[in-house]
Structures are given as structure tokens and as C-alpha cells.
């Protein structure tokens, strides 16, 4: 049962991160298409957002390992 819980935790966190990253990058591309001069500022904000979104799957993997090991 712990193995199933760990797999679900990893899968859902990866799914959420994929959707979140897709939304962040698509909105950044739209912003650059509308205002090309703001490209540098938008890219910096995008990388911060992607980094924050990617932190969640890492936390999910850690929790899954703790669940599986415990």
C-alpha cells in the first residue's frame, strides 16, 4: 500500500508541475509576442516561476520516499 501511495504522490506532483510549467511558459511567450522589449524582464520572472513550480515535485518525491521507507 505504501508503494501505491508513493507512486500516486510522485505522479500527481509531476502532473501538476508539467501543467504549471506549460502555463508559465505559454504566458511568457504571449507576453514577449505582445511586448518584445520586455523580453528580459519576462524571462527572469519566468525562470523564478518555473523554479518555484519545480520545487513542488521535489518535495513530493521526498515525501514519497519517506512514505515508502517508513
From Swiss-Prot:
Keywords: ATP synthesis, Cell membrane, CF(0), Hydrogen ion transport, Ion transport, Lipid-binding, Membrane, Transmembrane, Transmembrane helix, Transport. GO terms for molecular function: lipid binding; proton-transporting ATP synthase activity, rotational mechanism. The record marks 54 as: Reversibly protonated during proton transport. GO terms for cellular component: plasma membrane; proton-transporting ATP synthase complex; proton-transporting two-sector ATPase complex, proton-transporting domain. It is a multi-pass membrane protein. The chain crosses the membrane at residues 4-24, 45-65. It comes from the Bacteria. Gene3D superfamilies: F1F0 ATP synthase subunit C (1.20.20.10). It holds the Pfam family ATP-synt_C. It is found in: Cell membrane. One of its GO terms (biological process) is proton motive force-driven ATP synthesis. PROSITE patterns: ATPASE_C (PS00605). NCBIfam families: ATP_synt_c (TIGR01260), PRK06876.1 (NF005363). F-type ATPases have 2 components, F(1) - the catalytic core - and F(0) - the membrane proton channel. F(1) has five subunits: alpha(3), beta(3), gamma(1), delta(1), epsilon(1). F(0) has three main subunits: a(1), b(2) and c(10-14). The alpha and beta chains form an alternating ring which encloses part of the gamma chain. F(1) is attached to F(0) by a central stalk formed by the gamma and epsilon chains, while a peripheral stalk is formed by the delta and b chains. Belongs to the ATPase C chain family. F(1)F(0) ATP synthase produces ATP from ADP in the presence of a proton or sodium gradient. F-type ATPases consist of two structural domains, F(1) containing the extramembraneous catalytic core and F(0) containing the membrane proton channel, linked together by a central stalk and a peripheral stalk. During catalysis, ATP synthesis in the catalytic domain of F(1) is coupled via a rotary mechanism of the central stalk subunits to proton translocation. This is ATP synthase subunit c.
Amino acid at each position: 500500500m505504501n508503494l501505491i501511495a508513493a507512486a500516486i504522490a510522485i505522479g500527481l506532483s509531476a502532473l501538476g508541475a508539467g501543467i504549471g510549467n506549460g502555463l508559465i511558459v505559454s504566458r511568457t511567450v504571449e507576453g514577449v509576442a505582445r511586448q518584445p522589449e520586455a523580453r528580459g524582464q519576462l524571462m527572469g520572472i519566468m525562470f523564478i516561476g518555473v523554479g518555484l513550480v519545480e520545487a513542488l515535485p521535489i518535495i513530493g518525491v521526498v515525501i514519497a520516499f519517506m512514505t515508502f521507507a517508513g
